Curated annotation (Swiss-Prot):
Cellular location(s): Cell membrane
Transmembrane segments: 7-27, 509-529
Protein name (Swiss-Prot/TrEMBL): Uncharacterized protein Mb0921c
Source organism per UniProt: Mycobacterium bovis (strain ATCC BAA-935 / AF2122/97)
Cystines in this chain: none
Lipid bilayer topology: Multi-pass membrane protein
Keywords associated with the record: Cell membrane, Membrane, Transmembrane, Transmembrane helix
Main location: membrane
GO cellular component terms given for this protein: cytosol; plasma membrane
One Pfam family of this chain: NAD_binding_8
Coiled-coil residue windows: none
Xref: InterPro entries: FAD/NAD-bd_sf (IPR036188)
Length: 535
């Protein structure tokens, strides 16, 4: 192999959505880029698959909704990503009535008055609306900064307070300085309504609402900051359509994408060694002026031969299903189509969330398991074949909370136990067992699959099964953080000048956003520009 074949301006390790965004931006800028992906296809956790034999459904196996992908990234790269807004925000059956009443919230986030009354939350109507209005004073100003060089904490706060005054200052304090549980409890009194708000702080995050570490606050902020509004969208065609568009854009701009490339070693000088996926398993060596890494920080340390620091574990379970029809509800005031079009909260009241954390922290599977479901195919039936659409089939995705495999000791049979817990939780508020409406595959097996945190670690290399590659970070720097290099200014620095994070482990990198990839690419371009200016 010649030096030309080995030497690149940038080598990208990992072909998830962030790696694809980074590769596309840098190739678009005229740099020579090679992207290395261990699996047979790019996309990472943002992929669609046909999970069940003979059942033509493009299921989003891992990631499934989009809020944090800036339209500017899509436009810059010319990636035809299509997103659709869900017709309802959420429905929450009341556990106190075994699901015979519940709360339906429309697409603009306004609960229906009759439903508030039905769950005993009518006095909380104003507090609920005011809480989210105050949150938007923070998120509307923070959102554009996620694809700009980092502000310090004080700079971010000052901008928000200058924009929104005393009310914005109070909102900053509630969201950033104090446990978010205080603000939620102060805004509304109803147990169910508090839980509806609180779930956004606990997605993939093992914490209590009053946790002094504020890790729940950071998760909450990321779930509300997308677009400045926190609206979550359905990717048309499934999540795989998003990464397919990004991969096509990267290749069109000139990036070289190599799949089946299992990187086993990195060197701080930019040398990358990998095995090819083939019968010979040949070893390859390439060099980059820069190496952008989309794997977790723990995996990066291992590739460098450095000590691996402990990362926060993931805390979720995901269950995908195909059903013959949506299950019937016990609440006659809503239809299944309304209830499952948005987020269907199950056993996620404030008190249930706290009890579930306590049970999991003591090594017990929460009972009932807090979880939330949604039906992709109601908003986007294109993921179903014409035959399945005509038959009335639908998809259901269920996301369970407080289930880190690390706290349950023996993981033998954990997936089966988690599946049973998810189904039992769902059935506690349905008018019929969910098992009775499952579609069956070509082998007459029910169409249901479960992905645990252990599965994510094994299949995708996500350390601890953490969907954010570790604990999320605030989308701004601490006031005393050094911001003296482009990598630090963009939140992608490692201990090595040539190596930068471009995945979810980068600051501001979590969720399907492309922000980690964008910011790493901007850091590389800034480095090159500064070198050209140097005498």
């Amino acid at each position: 192999m010649s030096d030309h074949d080995r030497d690149f301006d940038v080598v990208v390790v990992g072909g998830g959505h962030n790696g694809l965004v980074a590769a596309a931006y840098l190739a678009r800028a005229g740099l020579r880029v090679r992207l290395l992906e261990r699996l047979a296809q790019t996309g990472g956790a943002a992929v669609s698959i046909q999970a069940f034999d003979g059942v033509e459904v493009a299921l989003s196996r891992y990631s499934y909704l989009v809020s944090l992908l800036p339209s500017r990234i899509v436009a810059d790269l010319g990636a035809p990503v299509r997103l659709a807004r869900r017709p309802f925000s959420s429905y929450t059956p009341a556990p106190a009535t075994a699901g015979r009443s519940g709360l339906l919230i429309g697409p603009t986030g306004e609960p229906r008055a009759a439903h508030l009354a039905a769950i005993g939350a009518a006095p909380d109507a104003h507090g609920f609306a005011a809480f989210y209005r105050r949150c938007r004073l923070v998120t509307a100003r923070l959102w554009p900064t996620l694809i700009e060089p980092l502000r310090t904490r004080e700079q971010a706060r000052r901008d928000i307070v200058e924009y929104g005054g005393h009310e914005a200052a109070a909102a900053w304090q509630a969201m950033v300085d104090e446990p978010i549980g205080h603000a939620i409890a102060g805004a509304v009194a109803n147990d169910l309504l508090r839980g509806v708000i609180a779930t956004d702080a606990l997605i993939g995050t093992f914490a209590r609402m009053h946790e002094p570490s504020l890790m729940q606050n950071i998760c909450f902020l990321y779930h509300l900051v997308g677009g400045g509004t926190g609206v979550w969208h359905v990717p048309i065609g499934g999540m795989g359509s998003v990464t397919s568009a990004l991969a096509t854009a990267a290749a069109r701009h000139g990036a070289e994408i190599v799949t089946g490339a299992d990187v086993f070693a990195l060197d701080p000088d930019g040398t990358v060694r990998y095995h090819s996926d083939g019968s010979d398993g040949a070893e390859h060596l390439v060099r980059g002026r820069f190496v952008l890494v989309g794997v977790t920080p723990a995996v990066l340390a291992s590739l460098l031969g450095e000590p691996v620091a402990a990362l926060a574990p993931g805390a979720q379970v995901k269950v995908n299903m195909v059903v013959r029809r949506l299950p019937r509800l016990r609440d006659d005031s809503v239809t299944p189509q309304q209830a499952f079009a948005g987020t269907f909260h199950v056993n996620e009241t404030w008190s249930q969330l706290d009890a579930a954390y306590s049970q999991a922290a003591s090594g017990r599977l929460p009972d009932p398991l807090p979880c939330e479901a949604y039906c992709h195919s109601l908003t986007d039936p294109s993921i179903l074949s014409a035959r399945l659409r005509d038959a009335g089939a639908q998809t259901l995705t269920v996301f369970g909370l407080h289930t880190p495999h690390s706290v349950f000791g023996d993981t033998e049979g954990l997936a089966e136990r988690l599946t049973a817990a998810v189904l039992a939780s769902l059935n506690s508020v349905l008018a019929e067992p969910i098992q009775d409406v499952l579609w069956t595959d070509a082998q007459s097996k029910p169409c249901i699959e479960t992905t645990t945190t252990l599965d994510l670690q094994r299949t995708l290399g996500m350390t601890g099964g953490n969907i954010f590659h570790g604990a999320l970070s605030w989308p701004f720097a601490d006031n005393d953080d050094p911001l003296d290099t482009p990598a630090r200014q963009w939140g992608v620095a490692t201990d090595h000048e040539r190596i930068m994070l471009c995945g979810s482990g980068a600051r501001r990198g979590g969720a399907v956003s492309g922000i980690g990839g964008h910011n790493a690419a901007m850091a590389v371009l800034a480095c090159l520009a500064s070198r050209r200016k140097s005498p």
